[in-house]
């Protein structure tokens, strides 16, 4: 019993990985371990070996590699020496961050090159077929449909975890949640190729969110590679610090904005950030952005290192004081627009999930939904068609370049003569003006982007929202230029309106409203290369965040809820009632616990009562003094070891030795560990296996041999082994009749094959009734916790702790549950689910509304079934009866109330 318990300790210390479940759009994560439970139940029933019994293969220390004679050993020893030299001269962190920045810069530049080639190919096909409108439409529509379909299919086949942005998942990973196969090599390949095809199709999709995921995968893979040489990267906790730096690198190399990238990654992935990781993010992001722009110069895309969207606003007086109300209006309107975008995106997913018939049909045809969405958007953006009224022929980069133009498009309602006319004229079609084109562009791109981001391909939403905000700001700027055609007059001079500055303000405001970040202002400054409009940008971004945060969660928090990831909502601001809510108002008082002097029956009942990951260990049910906590896996291992088939066979063997005394057994009674049983099979003389009649298979003692006996001798122990092997054998009369029916020729042509009988074949020694009786006896024995690793100091709170302080502690420490004690006595428990639902339901129009104690640790249905033969099987049974814990996963009702 000590070995499984000790092994279960090691297993229990590892966090549970959330499984990814494919859905039509985003997918969801769940901690449902039904498959593992079924495998474990089958193993226990068959008496198979425990998976944790296999000893880990020891790794050769680096000091002993020089004694190896193979070529691989010498190469590895050389690499270890080079690694030690670099570490001693430079440092491990610097090497890691330089490699991470270099790899991400190369990946970003290569992807941008491939995306630009795909977009140019689409424009080339469209221009080449302009003489035939039907062929031009087919080419315009078919090209993105093929790319999106390939991206969706490739991602679903290789790694479904690569779907979507990646920032919501990284936010939960940095909090301590383990997502299965989310940072693997195949997910990296699927993300890179799928994102390249998705952005190359021309759909309104973004790159920033997926690049955070790509950078995190690079950091994880690089950590595994460097851990081969030893050092700090063998420590799993060290990887979290590098993942935080990788998130900054992902944004930095995407927009060549290292400062904004670091700040943005901190805002969207962390509630509390360790300042010791600050320099890592800045160094890696700066190096990555530098290499990214150097590669653009090397490829002759740029003449020198410059901003990604260079602007030329006047620096002496970029704006006047009288324009600040207009900038404030942009911020407030962007706040409402950002909240509406998040609501529309979540509503699309909810509507599709509620339509069960359509959802089931599209789930069977997984590529149909992305193809239909792409077909719809491509049809509406067809340049000779409706796309001419919304600048459909421009890509996102060309759209931003024209929107940030510092020249005025409209003066007194007339379109100015613009140079170059290739891109700017897209905003002034023959039968419309600039205002109508901008309004149609904003409205159409708004719902198109909300719909396109639900496609199951690697994609983000930052860049589409950024473009929509720039268009809205440009609309306000052009309106201001039309209202003040001669500019704004002051005492001494006149200042002309610059619509491009309004576009910069609108882009930062709407992006900040959707993501609930202020760092978008810094990203805009680095993208444009000018900081002239810092005051209007900051005013608009702060106002937009104030409005959006009071209406809707951020886009990333909304996706976290859609995907059923563990999360802890923010308390928000201005809710002073939450300071008066105490832990005693929201805690669960019926805490599942085990006493120090409990029996195995009490352990079984405690496991059936709760799905929690840990159980409280108290001194006695009367005193309820908290001694510590024990992992659920350890309790399961204790119960499984107590009711294991090996113990059952050992008990049966001892009982047989005590009640039966054959001569051979008296001299040397066999033990369960050393007894060897044989199984006899009949084969033809030619070597082909023979299939005798069914009664012949079940002859008890005629074909059994034992060590030290002749093949014809009869030994009682061998007979017992074969009777257990062939349980339910027919009467001896039926066996004798079947023997007489065999011909003598077949008997002569047979030979005997002797093989070892497995332990699982010996379970037939005891009938189901005897097994149940034996288990009832074992369940009444006391539990010995000396072989279990007990946490003597689990996290505890007092009942007077406020809800605000509890939220801060949970966010800062990353804990998922805390016991509530009073002078050492256990009186309740608060989990992540209770805290989340208390925060979401704590404020009403009348004041504080305290939710009743929630049911995450209440009794689950424990109806017994007559078909169960063992108590261990009942423990690991179907999840509807005694499911394994889904700690931290929101309930199904959360998805309905989004």
From Swiss-Prot:
Biological process, per Gene Ontology: acinar cell differentiation; cell differentiation involved in salivary gland development; phagocytosis, engulfment; regulation of aldosterone biosynthetic process; regulation of resting membrane potential; retina development in camera-type eye; stabilization of membrane potential
Tissue specificity note: Ubiquitously expressed.
- Transmembrane helix listed as a keyword: yes
Kindly state which keywords UniProt assigns to this record, in alphabetical order.
Answer: CBS domain, Cell membrane, Cell projection, Chloride, Chloride channel, Ion channel, Ion transport, Membrane, Phosphoprotein, Postsynaptic cell membrane, Repeat, Synapse, Transmembrane, Transmembrane helix, Transport, Voltage-gated channel
Q: Where is this motif: Selectivity filter part_1?
A: 164-168
Q: Where is this motif: Selectivity filter part_3?
A: 460-464
InterPro entries listed in its UniProt record: CBS_dom_sf, Cl-channel-2, Cl-channel_core, Cl_channel_volt-gated, ClC
Q: Where is this region: Disordered?
A: 647-675, 726-766, 856-898
Pfam families per the UniProt record, alphabetical: Voltage_CLC
Self-association and partners: Homodimer. Interacts with auxiliary subunit HEPACAM.
* Record's protein name: Chloride channel protein 2
What is the protein's species of origin? Oryctolagus cuniculus (Rabbit)
Organism placement in taxonomy: Eukaryota, Metazoa, Chordata, Craniata, Vertebrata
State the encoding gene.
CLCN2
